[in-house]
């Protein structure tokens, strides 16, 4: 089967799902009808919020053949594609764990929660930003230094983290990004 063209149905489902993801992620900030939220553990129904992530996973699954064919058309080998998948998986899992822990940092660390979260997010951008390709050696060196600064910052943020009970960073819940990372495999 040829997967070279855009599939409008997948694009439409992706757009609707992304819109719903933004919407349901902000529901907690307002009063809303019960059916828009998540069903409770012992409730027998699905709220709108309960179907958004499965829809996202469906769209991801439907897009995989297109992404693989596109990668191979660009001349990537199977090893390069597998390496890309593993790297992205690790990145999403690390992001998920870090973001889940940022809201529970102990005051003794000496960094306010919002500042800690901003520094963690800055490290993500420095590490996983797709820097432009260039022939300029100084520019390439700058991009490499920025990535190393991001890695050092992320390691520092992991090392200094302590929650109010004295626990170090841990994966109590992977967070939505971590879950996406695991399903990416």
Regions found by a protein language model. Name each.
Residues 1-102:
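N-terminal signal-anchor module of multipass membrane proteins
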Residues 70-180:
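Membrane-interface helix-loop-helix modules in multi-pass inner-membrane proteins
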Residues 183-185:
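Hydrophobic, membrane-inserted alpha-helices
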């Amino acid at each position: 089967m040829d997967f070279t063209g855009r599939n409008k149905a997948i694009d439409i489902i992706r757009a609707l799902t992304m819109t719903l993801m933004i919407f349901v992620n902000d529901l907690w900030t307002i009063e809303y009808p019960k059916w828009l939220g998540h069903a409770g553990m012992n409730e027998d129904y699905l709220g709108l919020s309960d179907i958004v992530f499965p829809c996202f996973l469906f769209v991801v699954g439907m897009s995989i053949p297109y992404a693989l064919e596109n990668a191979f058309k660009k001349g990537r080998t199977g090893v390069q594609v597998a390496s890309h998948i593993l790297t992205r998986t690790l990145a999403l899992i690390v992001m998920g764990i870090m973001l889940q822990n940022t809201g529970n940092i102990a005051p003794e660390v000496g960094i306010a929660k919002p500042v800690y979260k901003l520094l963690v997010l800055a490290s993500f951008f420095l590490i996983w930003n797709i820097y432009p390709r260039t022939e300029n050696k100084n520019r390439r060196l700058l991009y490499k230094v920025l990535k190393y600064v991001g890695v050092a910052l992320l390691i520092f943020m992991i090392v200094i983290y302590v929650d109010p009970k004295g626990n170090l960073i841990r994966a109590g819940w992977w967070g939505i990004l971590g879950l996406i990372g695991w399903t990416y495999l």
